[in-house]
Amino acid sequence: MLTLHINGEQKQFPPDLNVAQLVATMSLAGKRFAVELNGEIVPRSGHATTPLRDGDQLEVVVAVGGG
């Protein structure tokens, strides 16, 4: 199993996961969001090619409109 820290919570995932696969599990389809991996923003174009490793720290931020 792969242990990731997402928005401060420790979670378990199957091995060989990339950012795009992780995002797909988070019900973010159609939403505007940003992913930070170990302190670095991962561009959307790199989600499918950015592998996740045991112990990685992620912050996933969803943009919320309002006024």
What is each stretch, according to the model?
Residues 1-66:
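Ubiquitin-like/PB1-type beta-grasp interaction modules and other compact soluble beta-rich domains
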